[in-house]
Amino acid sequence: MHSLSASEVESAVRRVWELFAAKKIDQWQSFYADIASVFGTASKRPEPARLVVLRRQREYLTSTTRVQVHVEKVDVELIGPDCAVAAYIMQLDAEQITRVSAAGQKEQEEHLENARVTHVFQRTSDGSLRIVHEHISAATI
């Protein structure tokens, strides 16, 4: 098996968000390792990816929801032959979502203009790339 490359990791990042926006749920969730942890924009602690995936599916991936994602330049640091960190800025626009705010109010849209995202990817024994950690934070100005 060959070592990871920056372009391979960048392609994986872009693919994750393409699948999310296209609501290709099975393919999108397969990018997350079983052991993955996630810090979302509203997280107070890391959560297992399987829970975050289910929540995102319920909130963002219904038939009526419209999602657009734009990923800026992806900076990749290779930290071993099978592991890399990807850091980037993205924009997310979601309409007709089913989400409850921290204040308990229903939200129907979300717009993240300059969300900061970090992914840690690891190559598995079958050669695929999996996210083992994700952190998304929204810039507050």
Predicted regions and their residues:
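Hydrophobic/aromatic beta-strand elements that line small-molecule binding cavities or substrate pockets
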Residues: 57, 71-76, 90-92, 116-122, ...
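Short beta-strand edge/turn micro-motifs at domain boundaries
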Residues: 105-141
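Short helix-adjacent coil turns
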Residues: 16, 20-27
